[in-house]
């Protein structure tokens, strides 16, 4: 339900904004006998849209936004959400999207990007995903510039390391709720997840145990059972990466895993909601994006 509503919002806003953008660019005054106007042209070539697994509405927005303003798009969806992306594509076709405007192309990211980024008609990149992947794409675009007809437009939204800073006189119960929901909804697999917190010792001494107690109550299981607050992370690669951070924290002299830390990949890729307390503001889990159910408190 949320994904459908958000995608509808994207499409409605984009249509409104495209009209506003066009109107605002028109000259305010034309001398008598002269007609001045500004025409906004689509890119000369195609846009490569690469969408993520964790945000269905963004997956629909990345290819449709450039198409709305006249561009041809090659849409490479995440390998972990082919079906939902396909459903969105079918909806656009049913709504009247002409053939060839958005070209749905599931497959290997490396193979598709290698072909697309070196094609002389490559004109733009619309991307949401990891910082490292975006940097790699940008570098390959730069290397391919001599082969391209124009300078590609590059638009990307990448990861982050969002934080919570608490005041010594904060609402401690409100802080517990904010950290729990901000860190562990969707297993922390979103760029807006609260993955680190800077808390006064006085605050942590009061509410730390309460936070751990609430986390211990979190229900985990099948995503089709809506009584579960958490489910599995997206795939084995994510499972291995996240558990690696947890295991290295357990072995560190400056970190303590105070709740969670367990995992099970016997059926699905389940990782317990985990809190790491550290005395080192530069600890690995304090500075690197984990993209999983791990909160580090300093």
Question: Where do the language-model regions lie?
Answer:
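Glycine- and acidic
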Residues: 1, 71-75, 193-195
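Short, solvent-exposed loop/beta-turn-alpha elements that line the ligand-binding surface or hinge
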Residues: 286
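Glycine-rich nucleotide-phosphate-binding loops and adjacent flexible coil segments
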Residues: 293
């Amino acid at each position: 339900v949320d994904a459908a509503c958000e995608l509808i919002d994207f499409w409605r806003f984009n249509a409104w904004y495209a009209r506003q953008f066009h109107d605002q660019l028109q000259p305010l005054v034309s001398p008598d006998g002269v007609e001045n106007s500004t025409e906004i042209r689509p890119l000369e070539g195609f846009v490569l849209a690469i969408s993520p697994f964790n945000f269905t509405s963004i997956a629909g927005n990345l290819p449709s936004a450039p198409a709305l303003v006249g561009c041809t798009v090659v849409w490479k969806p995440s390998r972990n959400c082919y079906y939902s992306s396909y459903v969105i594509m079918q909806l656009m076709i049913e709504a009247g999207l002409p053939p060839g405007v958005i070209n749905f192309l599931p497959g290997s990211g490396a193979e598709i990007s290698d072909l697309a980024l070196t094609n002389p008609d490559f004109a733009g990149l619309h991307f949401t995903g990891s910082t490292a992947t975006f940097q790699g794409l940008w570098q390959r675009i730069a290397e391919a510039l001599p082969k391209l007809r124009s300078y590609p437009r590059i638009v990307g939204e990448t990861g982050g390391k969002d934080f919570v800073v608490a005041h010594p006189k904060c609402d401690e119960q409100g802080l517990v709720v904010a950290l729990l929901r901000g860190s562990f909804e969707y297993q922390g697999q979103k760029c807006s997840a609260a993955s680190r917190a800077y808390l006064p010792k006085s605050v942590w001494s009061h509410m730390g145990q309460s936070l751990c107690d609430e986390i211990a109550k979190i229900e985990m299981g099948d995503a089709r059972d809506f009584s579960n607050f958490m489910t599995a992370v997206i795939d084995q690669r994510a499972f291995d990466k996240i558990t690696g951070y947890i295991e290295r924290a357990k072995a560190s002299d400056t970190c303590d895993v105070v709740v969670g830390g367990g995992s099970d990949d016997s059926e699905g890729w389940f990782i317990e909601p985990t809190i790491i307390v550290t005395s080192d503001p530069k600890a690995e889990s304090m500075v690197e994006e984990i993209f999983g159910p791990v909160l580090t408190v300093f």
